[in-house]
Amino acid sequence: MTEILGLPITRPVKVGIVVADFNDLVTTRLLAGAQQALRQAGIPEENILVVQVPGAMELPRVTRRLSETGVIDGVIALGAVVQGETDHYTYVCQQSAAGLAQASLTGPIPVMFGVLMTANMDQALNRAGGKGGNKGRECAQALLQVLSVEQQLSELR
């Protein structure tokens, strides 16, 4: 039986992080968590490309464009959508999630979904380094695991 596990990545990788500026109190913490996890995994600073976009709606397009450049091995998309008093929250959540899923499924490299969608700012902050952990950090760790699995899958040929 062959078993493929998310082992530590054995080749140099370059990672893109696309981060939304909107709700930057949260997204800067998500970004810091992702960068810290990548550095702890041995990814040098020069192999991390950070791209800032206005908000969650811009994440899918820029993530897809970045994934097509051929200069990175994987992308982490980070954002925070906090529910307000209108339906705008619902549409932003649906469209950013669908767009990032499409970029991941049809694009050339893996895309990690790190967009918080919360009922209030406290929930968002709890998931950006508070008692709920740091979802940016978790996305970085997940990306490295997926890259490892994909490397092992390519070696099956």
UniProtKB/Swiss-Prot annotation:
Pfam name, any one: DMRL_synthase
GO cellular component entries: cytosol; riboflavin synthase complex
Top-level enzyme category: transferase
Keyword hit for Transferase: yes
Amino acids binding 5-amino-6-(D-ribitylamino)uracil: 22, 56-58, 80-82, 113
Record NCBIfam families: lumazine-synth
Full protein name: 6,7-dimethyl-8-ribityllumazine synthase
Organism (species): Levilactobacillus brevis (strain ATCC 367 / BCRC 12310 / CIP 105137 / JCM 1170 / LMG 11437 / NCIMB 947 / NCTC 947) (Lactobacillus brevis)
Gene name, Swiss-Prot/TrEMBL: ribH
